[in-house]
């Protein structure tokens, strides 16, 4: 799904793409491994996209998206597009951009991830990746049921679910 969003930005001729990500913890000491950042970096390297000074991580929240975007703006050199690892991060980033009179998508394109309801109500409406939360819940419930029923042992697994890019109005093709 990350690759789909980045391919979309590449098709729109973006050669400088930023990343605003988050960290989640399983408990106070164990960091949950989210591969979105790794996929982002690998895609950029393979496609000769500049990303290095535009890579920031905080939390998966509006506030963190806002703070990371302010930090990026204060660096002075903005990318032409930003991939946000969640819609709340993107919504916070959008607010920071608007407060600094940086127009989306005219000055910078913005893509979120999750397709939360609020993403279609932002100005402009946010282009995002739809991740099927209901399907994730079904898989999770099935796994827990099988473990409790002793049909399977509790082993780590990674499940890839189909995601869809929802194209709205926060991205623009550049020359």
Regions from the PLM with identified roles:
Residues 1-175:
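Bacterial carbohydrate/catabolite-sensing allosteric modules
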């Amino acid at each position: 799904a990350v690759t789909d969003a980045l391919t979309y930005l590449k098709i729109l001729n973006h050669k400088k793409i930023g990343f605003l990500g988050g960290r989640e913890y399983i408990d106070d000491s164990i960091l949950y491994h989210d591969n979105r950042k790794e996929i982002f970096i690998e895609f950029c390297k393979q496609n000769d996209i500049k990303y290095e000074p535009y890579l920031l991580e905080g939390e998966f929240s509006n506030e963190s998206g806002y703070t990371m975007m302010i930090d990026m703006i204060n660096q002075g050199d903005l990318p032409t597009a930003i991939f946000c690892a969640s819609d709340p991060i993107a919504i916070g980033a959008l607010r920071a951009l608007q407060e600094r009179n940086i127009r989306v998508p005219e000055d910078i394109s913005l893509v979120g991830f999750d397709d939360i309801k609020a993403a279609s109500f932002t100005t402009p409406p946010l282009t995002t990746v739809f991740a099927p939360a209901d399907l994730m819940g079904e898989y999770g419930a099935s796994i827990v049921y099988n473990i409790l029923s002793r049909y399977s042992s509790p082993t780590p697994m990674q499940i890839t679910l189909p995601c869809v890019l929802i194209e709205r109005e926060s991205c623009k093709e550049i020359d």
